[in-house]
């Protein structure tokens, strides 16, 4: 029997998802194919070129002008434009305000568009 691991898109400019048990944040478990992207542009490029992953882990502060919140906004627009459900997600950011903003954005999208 052939099984294919699920894909986790790990957005973080600093934390290596394969070290220090960061995969505890994975919304789809630990048996995953990890794609580590470190910037807004890498995040968008991966999704456009490969489609949506099974799960996404968001960091907020990416060490550049664009943040994880900007990635989440782009993702919501992409899902709306393409009539897609949001992948399962988690937020591993140490920035409590950024974490809350990402979570509110994605939760509002799920409640307003996916449940209607």
Regions found by a protein language model. Name each.
Residues 1-116:
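Catalytic phosphate/metal-binding cores of nucleic-acid and nucleotide-processing enzymes, i.e., regions
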């Amino acid at each position: 029997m052939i099984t294919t691991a699920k894909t986790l898109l790990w957005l973080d400019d600093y934390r290596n998802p394969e070290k220090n048990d960061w995969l505890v944040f994975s919304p789809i478990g630990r048996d995953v194919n990890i794609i580590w992207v470190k910037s807004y542009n890498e995040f968008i490029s991966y999704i456009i070129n490969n489609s949506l992953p099974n799960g996404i882990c968001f960091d907020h502060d990416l060490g550049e002008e664009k943040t994880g919140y900007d990635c989440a906004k782009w993702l919501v627009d992409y899902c709306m434009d393409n009539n897609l459900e949001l992948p399962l997600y988690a937020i591993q950011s140490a920035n409590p305000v950024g974490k809350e903003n990402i979570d509110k954005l994605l939760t509002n999208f799920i409640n307003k568009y996916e449940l209607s």
